[in-house]
Amino acid sequence: MKRMMIVAALAALTTTTVAQAADPAAYVEYRKSVLSATSNYMKAIGITLKEDLAVPNQTADHAKAIASIMETLPAAFPEGTAGIAKTEAKAAIWKDFEAFKVASKKSQDAALELASAAETGDKAAIGAKLQALGGTCKACHKEFKAD
């Protein structure tokens, strides 16, 4: 239930609040926030695996939340928000927006695969899918995030 509320809130933000933001800097703050959430979800999954925590369904729920964020992430990078405020977003995002959308989709797909693995409870499979998701993040960062 809690996960569904989080996903619904994220979806509402991407389709309403972000779309209505008059200040381009609001997009920067929004995307920093959701990307930070993604990082924190991944860290939580890693801790759960490493420490063998008994938190039923959380890994799958976190992975599904990441997938939801990745599905809507490109909307947080509209024209006119490049170079606004302090950001690590490279101009390559707007120069080749289709490639950015493909990278986001790869992360979404990897997160859904992680969620599926998590539902089996197979820790080796979960670990492998978490690494695969991390690989999609790394590839996107290499192309679209400044150091």
Curated annotation (Swiss-Prot):
One of its GO terms (cellular component) is periplasmic space. Heme c binds at residues 31, 87-88, 137, 140-141. Binds 1 heme c group covalently per subunit. Residues 1-21 form the signal peptide. Keywords: Electron transport, Heme, Iron, Metal-binding, Signal, Transport. PROSITE patterns: CYTCII (PS51009). One of its GO terms (biological process) is electron transport chain. It comes from the Bacteria. One of its GO terms (molecular function) is heme binding. The keyword Transport applies. Gene3D superfamilies: Cytochrome c/b562. Homodimer. Cytochrome c' is the most widely occurring bacterial c-type cytochrome. Cytochromes c' are high-spin proteins and the heme has no sixth ligand. Their exact function is not known. This is Cytochrome c'. It comes from Rhodospirillum rubrum (strain ATCC 11170 / ATH 1.1.1 / DSM 467 / LMG 4362 / NCIMB 8255 / S1).
